[in-house]
């Protein structure tokens, strides 16, 4: 009867949804720039053949835990066979020098890598505070406000408090930033000033409405 037909329809639908017809055959990684997309895909190899409806977030999380550069991710099932993994990478702000070498960190102080040689294009962070200190947090906000290409020109950033951040560019130019307040405006003012006055040796943008140049 009708009830039997409906039951068969439901059972058939479940069999299709949870069976091999809707299993993972393609894994698409989106959002990687510093990470090797192939390595991330390989780490999720165990998901191939798993029905899309049975892809377990905790299993995926465990597979991605070995990539410290991943800040967050999301999963999207695209029937019949595609699993899309959207990655949000951590933004490195610079390196901290220690006896073990040069440690690349993000704005939260998460260690992304350690190497014996200083990575190119990464500013050296000089501060006595740890990752939870006001000065480190302020440094992170200031560096992240800079355009990526300009950030690569920063050789060193120092701060003894949250109110005396200073940058030294690879050209030797010194820029006094002050606090992390108005960082977006300070970033705009600094980059424009450096572009207009490439021979300046010192730029104070702590009060972005009244820049001091020498």
Could you describe each region identified by the protein language model?
Residues 1-5:
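N-terminal export and membrane-targeting signals
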Residues 6-35, 42, 51-101:
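Periplasmic polypeptide-binding modules associated with outer-membrane biogenesis and secretion
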Residues 23-25, 36, 56, 60, ...:
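Envelope-exposed proteins and targeting segments
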Residues 31-33, 87-91, 169-171, 179, ...:
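Flexible glycine-/small-residue-rich
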Residues 37, 41, 57, 61, ...:
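Extracytoplasmic/secreted envelope proteins and their assembly/folding machinery
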Residues 52-53, 94-97, 132-137, 176-179, ...:
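Solvent-exposed, non-transmembrane alpha-helical starts
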Residues 180-214:
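Extracytoplasmic/luminal low-complexity segments enriched in Pro/Gly and acidic/polar residues
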């Amino acid at each position: 009867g009708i009830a039997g037909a409906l039951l068969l329809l439901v059972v058939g639908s479940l069999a299709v949804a949870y069976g091999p017809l809707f299993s993972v055959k393609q894994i698409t990684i989106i959002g990687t720039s510093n990470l090797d997309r192939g390595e991330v895909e390989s780490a999720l190899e165990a998901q191939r053949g798993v029905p899309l409806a049975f892809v377990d977030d905790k299993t995926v999380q465990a597979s991605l835990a070995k990539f410290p550069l991943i800040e967050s991710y999301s999963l999207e099932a695209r029937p019949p066979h595609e699993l899309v993994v959207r990655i949000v990478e951590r933004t490195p702000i610079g390196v901290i020098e220690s006896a073990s070498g040069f440690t690349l960190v993000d704005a939260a102080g998460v260690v992304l890598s350690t190497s014996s040689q200083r990575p190119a294009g990464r500013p050296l962070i000089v501060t006595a505070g740890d990752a939870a200190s006001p000065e480190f947090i302020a440094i992170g906000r200031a560096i992240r406000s800079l355009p990526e290409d300009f950030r690569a020109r920063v050789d060193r950033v120092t701060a003894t408090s949250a109110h005396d951040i200073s940058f030294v560019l690879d050209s030797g130019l010194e820029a006094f930033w002050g606090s992390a307040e108005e960082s977006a405006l300070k970033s705009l003012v600094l980059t424009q000033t450096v572009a207009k006055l490439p021979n300046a040796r010192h730029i104070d943008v702590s009060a972005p409405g009244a820049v001091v140049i020498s």
